[in-house]
Structure formats: structure tokens, C-alpha cells
Amino acid sequence: MTEFPGSDGDQIAYEVTGLTATAEEVVAAPPELVWDLVADVTRMGGWSPECIHSAWLGEPGRARPGARFIGRNRFPDGFEYEVTCVVTEADRPRAFAWVVLDDTGDPARPSSSWRYRIDPLPDGGSRVGQRFTHGPGFSYLREVAAKAPGQAAGIIAARRDGLRANMSAALRAMKAAAETAQATGVGPG
């Protein structure tokens, strides 16, 4: 793990840890169908501008606490990296969450945490909220910000804004898939 000694590194770690981004969509499909989509991590690469591939490790398709999957991400600058994720919550049809492991592999000290919350609506649809929380573990954002401490605030803000935009785009794509499945009666698979 890279350490950032001194006040600049400490400040960067403080500013990155707890960084949060959220997005939300109303979907004209029931929570069960929406949950089945968000819990199928293999579909994320088709929806997200950043995540280009994900696959279950071990038993495929088992969205349950403790299950692991890999995610491959690509940033606008072309940098690609692969992460290992651990499912922390699989409460159909209400919530699905996971942590992204840093290089220590400790789920209690993740690089980031992701969570979908799915609320039923009176009309039979769903409100889907997605939340990203950074840290406290190591990440590429920490590394980039530490290399340019004078620009760290801007780098961190740009990442937060990029996350929000990417999360919104992914939710819109998932919404389209859910609403198509609901309208046609064909399952989300």
C-alpha cells in the first residue's frame, strides 16, 4: 500500500475518505425485477460508462453476502484496472451492496462501498437509489491526488462529479432494461 507521509498526504487521505456520490431513478417496474437486474453484476459492463466488465468468482450468479466478483474499469484517460469486490448485502427486493477491496484485501477497510436501495412505489414501480462511498482503503484516486497535492481538491471534485454522471448513466440504462422487460413480459436476463 502506498503511504502519504506529511500534512499534504494526511489532508488528501482525509478529503478522499468518505467522499460520496449518489444517483436515483424512478423505474416503471416492480422492485423484484429491478433487484434482479442490479444484483446481476455481469450486466454492469453494458450499462456503465466506467465499468467495462464484471464477472462472478466461484459460484456464478450467486448474489449473496460473501460472494465475490471482479470488476474491470476504464477511466477517460485510458487507465484500466481490475478490482475484487465482496457482496455485503443481498436483501431481495430492497437492497444490494458490495465493497471494493484495496490491496490489503480487508473488507473492513475497502477502497470503496457501493449500495443500491430499491423502494416500492404505490403505482407498482420502484425508486432506485445508488450510493458510492470512498475509503478508508487505498485507491487510484488517492494515488493521483497525492502526486499533485496542489491540485488535489480539483482532482477529488472531478472524480465525484464523474462518479455522479456515470452512476446516473448506468441507472438510466438499467431503467431502460427493466422497463423493457416489464413491458414485454420477458425476464431481465
Each language-model region and where it sits:
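Hydrophobic ligand-binding cavity/cleft-lining segments
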Residues: 1-65, 189
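Conserved long hydrophobic alpha-helices within structured protein cores
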Residues: 1-2, 86-95, 126-137
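Intrinsic-disorder/low-complexity, polar/charged segments enriched in Ser/Thr/Lys/Arg/Asp/Glu/Gln
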Residues: 18-26, 31, 68, 82, ...
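A generic "alpha-helical surface" signal
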Residues: 25, 161-165
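Well-ordered beta-strand positions
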Residues: 26, 88-89, 119-120
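Active-site phosphate/pyrophosphate- and oxyanion-stabilizing loops and adjacent acidic/basic residues
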Residues: 42, 85, 116
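Glycine-rich portal/gate segments that line the openings of hydrophobic small-molecule binding cavities
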Residues: 56-113, 165-188
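Beta-strand/loop substructures that line and gate deep hydrophobic ligand-binding cavities in soluble
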Residues: 101-162
